[in-house]
Amino acid sequence: GTLIRSLFHPFEEADKWPAVQQYLDILNENVADPKIALLGMQSFSSWLLFATAANACGEANDGVLTRECVLTAAADVDDWTAGGLHAPTDPGPEGGAAPPCGMLVEVNSDGEFERYFPEIGSSDDALDGFSCDDDSVVDVPANEGLGKVSPDQPI
């Protein structure tokens, strides 16, 4: 099957990760015939970040929310997991550095995701089912490929 790198715990492992199960429960309790997809969980993580930042602003400013306060509070977060939905990320003002943690999942013949790497609880499992290696992140200079492919294949 096809291997995919993921920063999010797969739905198929919801029994192991309470935040994923809570996300699925919220959908099933509040949405008729929910369409379970990773994009929804990514959006939920973004919403949780907004809610967390808005809550911090409300507490700091007697219940008053301003755009500037919410953006600043969100930018101050540098180890975001959405309560355990995904590996730690830095959603800072420039999107933060690429996260060094992830996992590989394989799409099986039924179209479901099966963990490929790391095995949970193994020495490769550095953090809640994710493998974390700072060497897995490399800087790619802007426009590195521009004009360097070949003259007959312009970008």
Region spans (language model):
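Extracytosolic ligand-binding ectodomains
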Residues: 1-155
